[in-house]
Regions:
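Gly/Gly-Pro- and Ser/Thr-rich, intrinsically disordered tail segments characteristic of DNA damage-repair
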Residues: 1-226, 232, 343, 350-355, ...
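DNA-contacting surface of Y-family translesion DNA polymerases
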Residues: 205-341, 350-355
Length: 359
């Protein structure tokens, strides 16, 4: 705990020194498709699988969002909300090409560049550079050279910059200046903190924590006792603290997705029936990274009703739907019990750095 307190003190002392930009493409996949097919610009479109294959929406444009369509939504649900929705097959080769062009533009402004995903990056500038002007220049270049738009947040650290980039979407920028952090954080809803999902948000609401200002009334010890590691992170983020550096060669170890079922799955057949939907959701997440699904070493995680769990991995297996099913069958032979949670994922090759995760 003393180490955490010292880290927070260091962040207070260093606050205002750094100039960090978070660059986030606006509905990237859809934007690239609209660039290629201008006739789609005014129509609601989504990148995703067909409804008869239990597909999942990877992203959609803003006209589609007015109907309630969202990323990670089942395609069948999206079509019910918007019957005129145009489904466009993904073109990952093209998206990666545009992503590389984007990173090339960003690298012109600083060597301190961290690519977070295919459509997102952090950039740190020198102390003497005018961050707002740089952000405006980047947005103009991306618009003119790539035919898409980005939104940019500017702040003293990565967390605040990421929050800021979502403030004036699309094709906008927002600056959180050092002397504005305290007031800004007081009114910021905790749900706007990256990593606070619906489950944690509900727990926080039950504790009376709606805004970051509410969280600031809790001591570090109280938050840790109530929320564990999430409480320690919340203590720092609710005050706008984040000492993470820019990782110029950031490498993830793995990418996975899990689902806890409202009712335990009673048998292997019921478990195997869930793989298709999990796989589609996992592919959506993989598509937002620079990697291809087939290059990942697959693994399956099973948590049984009694909270025991097992993981099966096989570097010789393919990271395909059928490959995950075969691994799941192996895992289920290890215990004859109902299942409460299933997870699938893939390990990236030759990685050693831990994933960065807030919660």
């Amino acid at each position: 705990m003393m180490e955490s307190a010292n880290a927070i003190l260091d962040q207070r002392q260093n606050c205002g020194v750094r100039k960090v930009l978070h660059i986030d493409c606006d509905c990237f996949f859809a934007a690239v498709e609209m660039r290629e097919r201008p006739e789609l610009r005014e129509r609601p479109i989504a990148i995703g699988g067909s409804s008869d294959r239990r597909g999942v929406i990877a992203t959609c444009n803003y006209p589609a969002r007015t109907f309630g369509v969202r990323s990670a939504m089942a395609t069948a649900t999206a079509l019910r909300l918007c019957p005129d929705l145009v489904l466009v097959p993904s073109n990952m080769a093209l998206y990666r090409e545009v992503s590389q062009q984007l990173m090339a533009i960003l690298s012109d402004y600083s060597t301190q560049l961290e690519q977070v995903s295919v459509d997102e990056a952090f950039l740190e500038l020198g102390r003497d550079e005018h961050a707002s002007s740089v952000a405006e220049g980047i947005r103009q270049r991306v618009r003119n050279e790539l035919g898409i738009t980005v939104s940019i947040g500017v702040a003293t650290n990565k967390f605040l910059a990421k929050v800021a980039s979502d403030w004036n979407k699309p094709d906008g920028q927002f600056v959180i200046r050092p002397n504005e952090i305290a007031d800004f954080m007081t009114t910021l809803p905790v749900r706007r903190i990256p990593g606070v999902g619906p489950a944690l948000q509900k727990r926080l609401e039950l504790a009376g924590i709606i805004t970051c200002g509410d969280a600031q009334t809790w001591s570090l010890m109280e938050l840790v006792r109530r929320f564990g590691r999430s409480g320690a992170s919340l203590y720092q983020r609710s005050r706008g603290y984040d000492s993470r550096p820019i990782h110029t060669e950031r490498v993830r170890k793995s990418l996975s997705i899990e689902h806890t079922f409202a009712h335990d799955l009673p048998n292997p057949g019921a478990c195997l029936a869930q793989v298709s939907e999990l796989y589609e959701r996992w592919l959506t997440r993989v598509s937002r990274t620079p990697w291809k699904a087939e290059s990942l070493a697959p693994f399956v995680k099973v948590k049984f009703a009694d909270f025991t769990q097992t993981t099966v991995a096989d570097i010789g297996e393919s990271a395909s739907e059928e490959g995950f099913k075969r691994l799941l069958q192996q895992a289920l032979t290890r215990a004859d019990k109902p299942v409460r949670l299933l997870g699938i994922g893939g390990k990236f090759p030759h990685t050693s750095e831990q994933q960065l995760s807030l919660f």
